Amino acid sequence: FDFYYNASAVEIKTKNSKQLSLLYPKINFSIDLSIQKLNKPKDLEDNFSDFYLLLDTHSKKSNGVFVREYEDLNKRIFSQIYEISGGVASPIQFYITDSTSNFIKGSLNLNFKSNYDSIFPSIQYVKKDVLILVESLNWRLR
């Protein structure tokens, strides 16, 4: 798959190519992606279960959760993006799937502890990048 991302982010791949990080060195954030192939019907259900379990962990510590859905039937992209407010380590959690072969879990991670109000503008900046990533994604091989 491929997608657009901010020129100020640095792409870091793992050797097994099941994980990818976009590092934002100037603000010390990262968008971390976990890429899963869906080999059998139960895999989609298992990935959703894992995603919502992690989301629940972060949501319990939050002041609220806002969800945004994105769907592009032509490109077979189905996504939900969760913005989690308050003092959480991962203020954005999202998934992208084609519902048959691919599932990507993503999160915005803060690489430091900070006051939510002081980093809110940076979170909003990177949230726009997450939206662009989701909307520009193509499932073709890289």
Language model segments and positions:
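Surface-exposed amphipathic alpha-helical segments
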Residues: 9, 108-142
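Signature of long, low-cysteine stretches enriched in small and polar/charged residues
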Residues: 19, 49-105
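Second-shell loop/turn segments in exported
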Residues: 32-42, 92-93, 116-124
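Short connector loops/turns at beta-strand edges and beta->alpha or beta->beta junctions
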Residues: 25-29, 100-102, 109-113
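Sec/Tat-exported extracytoplasmic proteins
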Residues: 13, 55-59, 137-141
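Secretory pathway targeting signatures of secreted, lumenal, and periplasmic proteins
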Residues: 1-53
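Beta-strand elements of well-folded, non-transmembrane domains
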Residues: 9, 37-39, 86-88, 110-112
